[in-house]
Amino acid sequence: MKRAFIMVLDSFGIGATEDADRFGDVGSDTLGHIAEACAKGEADNGRKGPLNLPNLTRLGLVKAHEGSTGKIAAGMDGNADVIGAYAWAHELSSGKDTPSGHWEIAGVPVLFDWGYFSDHENSFPQELLDKLVKRANLPGYLGNCHSSGTVILDQLGEEHMKTGKPIFYTSADSVFQIACHEETFGLDKLYELCEIAREELTEGGYNIGRVIARPFIGDKAGNFQRTGNRHDLAVEPPAPTVLQKLVDEKQGHVVSVGKIADIYANCGITKKVKATGLDALFDATLKEMKEAGDKTIVFTNFVDFDSSWGHRRDIAGYAAGLELFDRRLPELMELVGEDDILILTADHGCDPSWTGTDHTREHIPVLIYGPKVKPGSLGHRETFADIGQTLATYFGTSPMDYGKNML
């Protein structure tokens, strides 16, 4: 029985890539800077001391980081016995965004340039805004700018509740984000508005990767909170991913846990499981792994590393999240059967010590574990698509156009 379990620690980069200068990210290192802060006692907030990731270390994380950066992460064990295969991978795609990273992991790098809304104020074309107001029968809109998602709620959340005007905002990513109150505006109404925005962006040729619904609750600035009902409307990948090939060619199954299905626009997904928060995502993943049959991929995105700690530049929170993940990792490893493979990876970096709030262009870890996987270094990989090609070979689908089999 062949099964693959893919765990994406969203934004868990392990050191700047060779082309990081193109992105202003030279020196970024999500893992390294978190470990450094922990070793200095600067991340003792509900947790304490050096970053403690013994299980990820056994799978080769510290070695992969050393391969990427040339140094051992502060306070971590560079001499631990490694029981998995490990690599550090460079991104071939032109961006450092979520869809590009995930699609490339599945064998389809993004070699075109996304469209972006580059102006920090008055970010969106008036023609687009006018169409959204008319089609969705809106009283107007707020925002129309670049912003952090939590900051803009404090700035405009109360006005939104009073006026019913949705909050439109963007970032350095190829996104159009819409924040609305779940109760006063309504979740269904927000989703409908996002569908309209997706249609207009596609028909208008803006080439925007995602429209993101950002529902929130609360009654005043300071206590607004985003809920777990986020919904991403992505464009479809430009070619069949290994997920699609497994389903189409082998009548296999692909189980999405968390936001995976949204990222792939539901292409190649046979089952969707929703969960919010690290523990809930872990629990849902364990349940699906126990039930998974032959020719199945269980694919989970642990978004909190990115959304809760990376973008918010919360080093202590990121460290605590990693340690929680590491404590629970043996539960996953125990479910890996004789012919199964477990792959732990990321989709980009988001160094919580870095300036600004955006992603960082970094190598990602590729940690592969299974009874038949030979432990040791798989070296530097030129593309995340090596993961997709490895899966294509493993399941016996037609080969991907990009990437090399690692096993």
Swiss-Prot record:
Pfam family, one: Metalloenzyme
Chain sites annotated for binding Mn(2+) 1: D10, D347, H348
Binding site for Mn(2+) 2: D306, H311, H359
Broad EC category: isomerase
Cofactor binding notes: Binds 2 manganese ions.
Cofactor(s) demanded: Mn(2+)
This protein's name: Phosphopentomutase
